[in-house]
């Protein structure tokens, strides 16, 4: 191996080539337009670069005095200014229609998403089918339907980005930005915060689950009800006794606080802590006792007074909320 550093860099680059968070593996119309524009812009930039290289090579190879002043100026004018301007103008005309927002209708599903340090509050708007619904760190969408995402923030500026669905949009405290999307295929995808927002910025992801319309309607109707798994368990008693309900809501109980993530249907979620850990019993118990270890800067206080067995009991209770 003549150049180990080159191979090391190449291998590190290959390690980042996966489809988990890629703007090239799309499942939405908006992301498809972004991908097509990116490809065309890359081609246009390559053409302009090639023209400039040709001018440079032509000038190097020409004998001294072979190009007159006026001849050289014409080459520079046409190939160095007019040509690139025409290419860039054509690319701009192509991109303008894609900047127009998608049309919406009064009956379209509206989902409010708010970025907080360091998690996501998700609220499905009320409709004729039923009341609103609050969740956290997971967004479910019906395939083939237009969805209006109303984006805001509670603390600092965040940036909402689902690479495979649409472009980035800032989430600004005190302001609501709208992003209209339409998923084209079912599946589970990843979204992230794309703007530095604090210590755990890199630990702030969320799941996007695109579902067949019938499955989505059934899920939404079921999720509006009380969480299954409620009862007189030891974990629920500990949850109540240690004041967890002062920050977290669970539908079907007296807890309706809105400071921290809503824990209703927690047992259905695929990740813990906004996409950073698998929701195993051990991880949930450890997060309850010392959340700052997994997520520095999180506002949830530690509970060192809980024994390991007590934390595990609360974890079992949360796992049963489905």
Language-model-derived ranges and their functions:
Residues 26-63:
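Membrane-embedded alpha-helical segments of integral membrane proteins
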Residues 18-36, 63-258, 275-296, 302-316:
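Non-transmembrane, membrane-proximal soluble domains of secreted or membrane proteins
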Residues 11-13, 42-56, 81-91:
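Hydrophobic alpha-helical transmembrane segments of multi-pass integral membrane proteins
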